[in-house]
Amino acid sequence: VSDLTFTGYDPSFEDKEKLYAACLDYDFSKFVCSGEIPETRGIKDMMTREDQYRMNSCGGFGMAHTGQVCWWLQTGDFREFNPHWAYIMGQQIDGRKTDSGVSIRGVVEAAKRFGLLVQDVENDGKLEFSYPRDNYRFRYPKEAAAIAAQRKVGYSVAVPGFKAKLNFLQANQGAIVNGGSWGNWKPGRDGICRKFVRTTRYSGSYHARAYVDWITIRGEVFLVEANSHFRTFGDNGFSYHSEEFVEAQDKDPAFVAVGVSDISLGPGDVPKQRAPRRYVKLS
């Protein structure tokens, strides 16, 4: 967003204690990678996305993008989940009823409790539940809740630090939804972010996004972050975060991040016949 206005994430109403208390008690930094790990999974060239436009729905987009990667890992198929649904369901957890943003805890808990709403129910190219763009007050038919309930997130896990995040992604567990400072740093022309600058009351804004992959550029590994302002930000909405950037960002009091995985399968959903290699073993 060019004017760095509010985009939908406010760290002041994030309940970190409840967010992390609901996470699986597991330390992904204790994994050690083994075998042939590819330079990237190529997620950015496969996943489909939309722009959030003027709605403060970035938290819903972060959760929907995360869910899309989880779904591909489980089924081998990319399906878009409705960001607006994830947004307003998350607001139910937060107790909010206006277009005023949502917490990461809200969208994660809602994805576990209410599920994610697939946009193309029949997977035939026709979107029964498309993103309503600027229509925050759009109301879904009754059957939407039952359809979403078929596809609930199974677990979340805290992933503090670059190593834990990278291991979670390279373990093919899922993707990582996050929120925090944004707007007062920009990726370079190649999409790379190296210097993190935290948001203050005088600069930038806050935003929710998702780490969906890793990528190796000139021998260096970066985390790939998908942004819901992809028409105006980074490499077609993706930025590549260096280890130093991620470690500095993790120290920002406004930043939260959790990995999510294991979406339940609905009728007609077919799991992959051969599970993707996990690339990791316990240390």
Predicted feature locations:
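Active-site-adjacent structural segments surrounding the nucleophilic cysteine of cysteine proteases
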Residues: 1-59, 70-96, 116-139
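Predominantly the structural core of cysteine protease catalytic domains
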Residues: 2-9, 54, 64-68, 92-226, ...
